[in-house]
Amino acid sequence: MKEHYNMSKRILIMGLPGAGKTTLADKLRTYLETAGIIVDWFNADEIRKQFNDWDFSHAGRIRQSLRMFDLSKTSDADFVICDFVAPLVEMRNNYKADWTIWVDSIKKGRYEDTNKAFAEPAIYDFRIPEQD
């Protein structure tokens, strides 16, 4: 049986911590809502707070990506924006984004373990190379 989920378009905004993902997500949400488009926005840090779940092991990162996808499936919005680091290819694949925006404005983030784990995406729709 084929999995059924909503028709919301999923936008993944990913990149290293401090690159500007949340700032971009907020601006994109505001822009779309001003145009009358219904948007849900899920920020990974805020979602982790709800689950009291700050596990950054490989399994913890995968769990978070699946959680973000599950949340996106519950939305009736036109667009669902999720901003999270998504350092692993598997995490990006789990989210099943319609569009991926890579915020590539910094070369090193705040957390060395995340810098080591981060695999630059080979596939993305938009790349933001600098903060502005």
Name each model feature, range by range.
Residues 58-111:
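Glycine-rich phosphate-binding loop used to anchor ATP phosphates in small-molecule kinases
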Residues 17:
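The conserved Walker
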Residues 2-8:
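Phosphate-binding P-loop
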